[in-house]
Amino acid sequence: MSKLAEKLKAVAAAVASIEKQFGRGSVMTLGGEAREQKVAVIPSGSVGVDRALGVGGYPRGRVVEVFGNESSGKTTLTLHAIAQVQAAGGVAAFIDAEHALDVSYARKLGVRVEELLVSQPDTGEQALEITEHLVRSGAVDLIVVDSVAALVPRAEIEGEMGDAHMGVQARLMSQALRKLTGAVSRSGTCIIFINQIRMKIGVMFGNPETTTGGNALKFYASVRMEIRRTGNIKDGDAVVGSKARVKVVKNKVAPPFQEAEFDLMYGSGIHRVGEVLDLGVATGLIEKSGSYFSLRGERIGQGRERAAEWLREHPDVLEALGKEITGTSALPSSPAPVEVAA
């Protein structure tokens, strides 16, 4: 018997022993077909962000972290993702640890608030236990936790003001993520943790910025996205929105360090039409000659506003352009694992 045959026989015996002890499917090969399966995703609601993520959206069965400064658009970005999930017939949950969810604003972004699962927990432990229950149900597609900084440990809430609680929140996050990641992968749920930026004390060289909750989330997150406000959008003297830039600083499902820029309009969120128009020009799908915009040889408007108005009046063209820009045409289903025959 050759060495290869002996190895295969030993592997088959080991697999049979493992499955006898832990159940069928404990050990498996991915198989030839599974290697070619696309990553199942949830659209972010932003064409640019979907493109920057490299797979067309937030990956299912993974942990995602969105962090940034105050009023940079973190919650708005996640509410757009919730609206996308609901539009596709999925179920979404919002763990409002900050107790600051604006229901009327969420409705303006397309969220069906009457169908949204909302929890406003009293402690960090309660928030993460609720999250675990929702994940293990296998019925929730997207869970947003807003925010890590507001996941206050029970010991801190029950203690006196001014008491020192060094590392309690970091230990809480580390324990929770150890329990959650396996269940998240099996259920296909995507969890988005919103996080805040803090400044390290005494840093003389390098970046003094860090995120709350310790290092566990940095390790367990498959995708980490930094969102920053880069400027204001004015209508005359009135500020009507802000410009935002998203940078994918960590990505386990595609090449990292991709960026996306978009306009956040007050009261309506991401300016999708303007984003598709700008990216269409950047990718060559829309031709721009002087102030004129053309699509496949047909002139659609003079000036950005008129071209955007034309796209707004043709939603089917807008949707098709968005899919061409991101390179995706449909939501892939979760790949089925292939078991090893004993």
UniProtKB/Swiss-Prot annotation:
GO terms for biological process: DNA recombination; DNA repair; SOS response. It is found in: Cytoplasm. There are two genes for RecA in M.xanthus; recA1 seems less functional than recA2. Can catalyze the hydrolysis of ATP in the presence of single-stranded DNA, the ATP-dependent uptake of single-stranded DNA by duplex DNA, and the ATP-dependent hybridization of homologous single-stranded DNAs. It interacts with LexA causing its activation and leading to its autocatalytic cleavage. It holds the Pfam family RecA. CDD domains: RecA (cd00983). The keyword Kinase does not apply. Belongs to the RecA family. One of its GO terms (molecular function) is ATP binding. PROSITE patterns: RECA_1, RECA_2, RECA_3. The keyword rRNA-binding does not apply. Its main location: cytoplasm. One of its GO terms (cellular component) is cytosol. This is Protein RecA 1. ATP binds at G68, N69, E70, S71, S72, G73, K74, T75. Keywords: ATP-binding, Cytoplasm, DNA damage, DNA recombination, DNA repair, DNA-binding, Nucleotide-binding, SOS response.
